[in-house]
Amino acid sequence: MDHLPIFCQLRDRDCLIVGGGDVAERKARLLLDAGARLTVNALAFIPQFTAWADAGMLTLVEGPFDESLLDTCWLAIAATDDDALNQRVSEAAEARRIFCNVVDAPKAASFIMPSIIDRSPLMVAVSSGGTSPVLARLLREKLESLLPLHLGQVAKYAGQLRGRVKQQFATMGERRRFWEKLFVNDRLAQSLANNDQKAITETTEQLINEPLDHRGEVVLVGAGPGDAGLLTLKGLQQIQQADVVVYDRLISDDIMNLVRRDADRVFVGKRAGYHCVPQEEINQILLREAQKGKRVVRLKGGDPFIFGRGGEELETLCNAGIPFSVVPGITAASGCSAYSGIPLTHRDYAQSVRLITGHLKTGGELDWENLAAEKQTLVFYMGLNQAATIQQKLIEYGMPGEMPVAIVENGTAVTQRVIDGTLTQLGELAQQMNSPSLIIIGRVVGLRDKLNWFSNH
């Protein structure tokens, strides 16, 4: 993060704009809207500045820039068409530890101006860090279309209710659930827009007096195989509403950055062959947090019902009568194959796909004879440590040694690495890779050279 987004309280605080043209006028409008006590310095001014000055809204200082104008300022903007003058203003402000924006020169500025969506008191700021103002503007326009014009009235009304809500609902969780109900109530929003006081009062009383569901719940969310962009919209909504997020080592930092900031985070770092927290204890963590009335998200890599032990966790909750739901995710087989240019099925090469765990329990044995058959694709999860055994068994049961294989490490992430070869090389290839990795075996692997689009690693 190159810039920290902050919202400044400028009401009745001295601010300076150097420049008297159209660009300076646009900046002045923003500062005046924020209630700043504004001084504008330039050699000449467009008529709008004169009109504002005549109305007593700002002070004009006609003449060359004088550094002393900054002495009482909280914030300054250099908005002239003279680069040297803009630089001088910036340096003078820097020497006084005053934040200064330099129009069209973000590297010379100590702060930048974002694109703004104003639904006061709700404000949304969009910034590209000065690298692409057009992109920021396009995003602002898209957000403008999504946010109702009366949203600010709802936010202002919520501020008026805060004291009563705090008295009415004892816990933070109860208050949050009330606010969520209020903000999605279309009737209240429309009543506020129409200034219909009777309807506003009736709807508010109904919302406040409705019994809240004090039971906790658990939502099992599949986070996908790595790329945060593959998280589903519903999954995103759930992690942003959670009181507690229980997650493991397969969840990327990019995804964790999307979690609600004040949610509790419980790390239970699992990996094949080793569990930082035993599965039974994970089950109990989910149960305990839900019994406290909290909304718990169990965030799992891939899809929670495909080698994710999601069923085991939900059985514990079901036996205890805890409400639960499941948000599917893109499983590793689908994500890794797509990002590696390997179609799992193909009319000429594979009419079926088998998803197999390579993390076998002691004494467990797979149906190797059927797995060795042609016209199918095998995908082994957690199979890196068993690669030599997989190679030996498949060849022993008749799979050709030249069968194409691929191992995908950190699939779909920017650090994805893929190596391919033949079945006779599988054990050797596995020694070059690290967990988490996925093994794909089948004729479809031979299409990778033609269909690979994501990387050449």
From Swiss-Prot:
Query: Phosphoserine: which positions carry it?
Result: S128
Task: Recite the UniProt keywords alphabetically.
Answer: Cobalamin biosynthesis, Lyase, Methyltransferase, Multifunctional enzyme, NAD, Oxidoreductase, Phosphoprotein, Porphyrin biosynthesis, S-adenosyl-L-methionine, Transferase
- What residues form the catalytic site here? D248 (proton acceptor), K270 (proton donor)
Return the CDD domains for the record.
Answer: SUMT
Under which EC number(s) is this enzyme classified? 2.1.1.107, 1.3.1.76, 4.99.1.4
Region annotation Precorrin-2 dehydrogenase /sirohydrochlorin ferrochelatase: where it falls in the sequence = 1-204
Say which domain of life the source belongs to: Bacteria
Q: Which residues bind S-adenosyl-L-methionine?
A: P225, G301, G302, D303, I306, T331, A332, M382, G411
Give the residues the record marks as binding NAD(+): D22, V23, L43, A44
Q: Does the keyword Transcription apply?
A: no
Which biological pathway? Answer: Cofactor biosynthesis; adenosylcobalamin biosynthesis; precorrin-2 from uroporphyrinogen III: step 1/1; Cofactor biosynthesis; adenosylcobalamin biosynthesis; sirohydrochlorin from precorrin-2: step 1/1; Porphyrin-containing compound metabolism; siroheme biosynthesis; precorrin-2 from uroporphyrinogen III: step 1/1; Porphyrin-containing compound metabolism; siroheme biosynthesis; siroheme from sirohydrochlorin: step 1/1
Tell me the disulfide pairings in this chain. none
* A Pfam family matched in the record: NAD_binding_7
Which family does the similarity line name?
In the N-terminal section; belongs to the precorrin-2 dehydrogenase / sirohydrochlorin ferrochelatase family. In the C-terminal section; belongs to the precorrin methyltransferase family.
* Function field: Then it catalyzes the NAD-dependent ring dehydrogenation of precorrin-2 to yield sirohydrochlorin. Finally, it catalyzes the ferrochelation of sirohydrochlorin to yield siroheme.
This protein is called what? Siroheme synthase
Which gene produces this protein? cysG
